[in-house]
């Protein structure tokens, strides 16, 4: 049955392909860019479940990193192509089925990213005051999906962030920043008000493994050390001598050695100045912990109060204790995002690996006529530059397969024109997105900020469709 479904004739392959891309983040746009560069006559329809484009560039990049968002200008150039169509506020799997897409496109590219979270799976993870980094990032970036967080920073003196990646450092930096320095950015003004009331005194960025396993980069680490509103304090024990052992560092690459040198230098400086845990002064304080695995989040009256850790790094001078506890009224896990399957994938022969959180593929190829790109292809790793190269590779595979007359989807080649009559949701086109964006810039001018994003999908849709309910 499945073989009959995916079989196609090659009679329509004399022309350029009609491609449907699901998602509108970096992987999606870079795939579109490369496809258009390989063949200027390719037609691309890009489906996005939100009313607005750009995915994690819009809702994941820290507001104090506006230079990273400059890539939006490149994506906008792509979207202005006459061969390109943006279809926002269209949920693939609910508003339109994957099966219907296969009937109208030569090729589909799954590039919808990772909207789920990995969990620790420990007792207390559902207590009030426990959040994923994605939720907190979404809150301060005005993501409509994360505007109901009941997080009152005025009630927080101690915070724990689990994870040693760049997202962890981003979250920590924002929580430790001076609100006045963030106000000119496009940060959520409601978050900013909460930050102004913050009573945060100590923030611990905790890693389950040792220093050699950190995923963050030296740029993000330097930004934390450079904060004028916060001061770094060392743990009550000193790793430094062991960390500087040439035997331990001999297998590290140059960037990791530079990072290690910076970190050890700052720890030694903190120790010499007697800035050791539980250090406290007028400024907010933060530190990095290694070799601590959370085993239980302890609460009081439904709220997080302490976090119990197992000590797993023998380098620690307190390793004989086996366990340690850190106070926390805020616990943020930053251990990775996770892609989720789209409804109807099995119906069209798309295999999804639930354990890995990816679409099963071979170098982006899923099955004839269906490909994948970005985090849903290989997992939530890499920066925008690596996503670009990965997306280019998928696009090149599609172009090569098309020119080689390999199997693609048997379809009408109508694309969106074959689907739109059955779509009930109000669709946001590229011209509509520009109206939304201009309105956000105007909103920002009132607060002397870069822009003020809409915090609800409904408000964006009402702006374009005033009469819609």
Curated annotation (Swiss-Prot):
NADP(+) binds at residues 164-167, 208-209, 220, 382. Residues 1-38 form a transit peptide. Its cofactor is FAD. One of its GO terms (molecular function) is oxidoreductase activity. InterPro entries: FAD/NAD-bd_sf, FAD/NAD-binding_dom, Ferredox_Rdtase, Ferredox_Rdtase_adrenod. Keywords: Electron transport, FAD, Flavoprotein, Membrane, Mitochondrion, Mitochondrion inner membrane, NADP, Oxidoreductase, Transit peptide, Transport. It comes from the Eukaryota. Pfam families: Pyr_redox_2. GO terms for cellular component: mitochondrial [2Fe-2S] assembly complex; mitochondrial inner membrane; mitochondrion. The keyword Flavoprotein applies. It is a peripheral membrane protein. It catalyses: 2 reduced [adrenodoxin] + NADP(+) + H(+) = 2 oxidized [adrenodoxin] + NADPH. Adrenodoxin reductase transfers electrons from NADPH to adrenodoxin, which is involved in heme A biosynthesis and in iron-sulfur cluster assembly. Involved in the electron transfer to heme A synthase etp1(cd), a heme protein that catalyzes the conversion of heme O to heme A. Required for the de novo synthesis of Fe-S clusters on iron sulfur cluster assembly protein isu1. Involved in electron delivery for Fe-S cluster synthesis. Essential for coenzyme Q biosynthesis. May be involved in the electron transfer required for the hydroxylation reaction performed by coq6. Belongs to the ferredoxin--NADP reductase type 1 family. This is Probable NADPH:adrenodoxin oxidoreductase, mitochondrial. The gene is arh1.
């Amino acid at each position: 049955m499945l073989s009959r479904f995916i079989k196609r004739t090659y009679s329509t392959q004399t022309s350029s392909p009609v491609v449907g891309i699901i998602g509108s983040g970096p992987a999606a746009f870079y795939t579109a860019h490369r496809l258009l560069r390989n063949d200027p006559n390719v037609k691309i329809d890009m489906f996005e479940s939100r009313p607005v484009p750009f995915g994690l560039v819009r809702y994941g990049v820290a507001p104090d990193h506006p230079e990273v968002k400059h890539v939006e200008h490149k994506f906008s150039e792509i979207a202005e192509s006459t061969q390109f169509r943006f279809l926002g506020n269209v949920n693939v799997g609910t508003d339109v089925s994957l099966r219907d897409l296969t009937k109208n496109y030569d090729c589909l590219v799954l590039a919808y990213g990772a909207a789920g979270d990995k969990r620790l799976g420990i007792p207390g993870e559902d207590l009030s005051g426990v959040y994923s980094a994605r939720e907190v990032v979404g809150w301060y970036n005005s993501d409509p999906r994360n505007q109901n967080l009941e997080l009152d920073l005025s009630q927080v003196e101690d915070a724990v962030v689990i994870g040693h990646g760049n997202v962890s450092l981003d979250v920590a930096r924002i929580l430790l920043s001076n609100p006045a320095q963030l106000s000119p950015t496009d940060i959520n003004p409601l978050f900013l008000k909460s930050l102004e009331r913050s009573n945060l005194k100590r923030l611990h960025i905790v890693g389950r493994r040792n220093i050699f396993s950190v995923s963050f980069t030296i740029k993000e680490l330097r930004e934390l050390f450079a904060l004028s509103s916060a001061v770094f304090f060392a743990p009550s024990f000193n790793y430094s001598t062991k960390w500087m052992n040439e035997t331990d560092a001999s297998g590290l690459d140059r960037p990791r050695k530079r990072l290690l040198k910076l970190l050890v230098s700052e720890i030694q400086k903190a120790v010499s100045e007697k800035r050791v845990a539980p250090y406290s002064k007028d400024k907010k304080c933060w530190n990095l912990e290694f070799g601590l695995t959370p085993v239980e989040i302890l609460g009081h009256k439904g709220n997080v109060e302490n976090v119990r850790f197992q000590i797993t790094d023998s380098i620690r001078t307190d390793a004989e204790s086996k366990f340690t506890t850190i106070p926390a009224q805020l616990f943020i896990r930053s251990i990775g995002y996770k892609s989720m399957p789209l409804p109807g994938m099995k119906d069209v022969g798309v295999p999804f690996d639930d354990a890995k959180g990816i679409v099963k593929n071979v170098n982006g190829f899923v099955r004839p006529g269906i490909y994948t790109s970005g985090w849903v292809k290989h997992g939530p790793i890499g920066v925008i530059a690596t996503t670009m190269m990965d997306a280019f590779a998928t696009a090149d595979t599609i172009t090569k397969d098309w020119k080689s007359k390999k199997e693609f989807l048997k379809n009408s080649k109508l694309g969106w024109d074959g689907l739109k009559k059955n779509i009930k949701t109000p669709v946001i086109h590229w011209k509509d997105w520009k109206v939304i964006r201009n309105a956000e810039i105007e909103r920002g001018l009132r607060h002397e900020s870069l822009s003020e994003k809409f915090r609800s999908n409904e408000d964006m849709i009402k702006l374009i469709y005033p009469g819609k309910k």
